[in-house]
Amino acid sequence: LAPTDKSEEEILAWEMEGTRDEEIHRILTVIRPLLAETDSIPIIMGGDFNVHSHLDWTEATRNLYHHGGAVVNWPVSIAMEEAGFKDSFREMNSDPVASPGVTWLADADSLETECRMDRFDFIYYQGKTIQAIASECYDNSLGKTFTFKGEDFFYPSDHGFVLSKFELK
């Protein structure tokens, strides 16, 4: 979790102490040949990235969700964008204040803006033959029952999830 009492520079220095930036660059290097084919074969890449997004830590959210006044260009989401990927949730829900897309809560019983919460789970995509047409985030907590499409499930994660719908052209 970001030390939100710090400046953007201090937060980014803290982030770079970890391995996520190195990991995403390694992944992007490995899939580079596939990225060259996205004009005809789309790519969807999703999961628990366990990192914040620059699309959520904006001027509009700087004083919400314990961002501590910071606007941060998080390196992993920047790397994904620079590699040509689109964030399906943020593309369909462009306002991070109206649609924060919470998938992780420090206090799982609160959705208050004072609560430590963020979106760590993403579905990225790219390609000329694919377009996101809907995307939702579901927040939930480890061990709670979760109802999805009328069915009850034991929820095995401390993160919620993203559900995006795509149209193939």
Question: For each predicted feature, which ranges?
Answer:
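A long, amphipathic alpha-helix that forms part
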Residues: 11-39
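A solvent-exposed, charged loop/short amphipathic helix patch at secondary-structure junctions
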Residues: 1-18, 60-68
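Metal-dependent phosphoester-hydrolase catalytic domains
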Residues: 33-44, 50-169
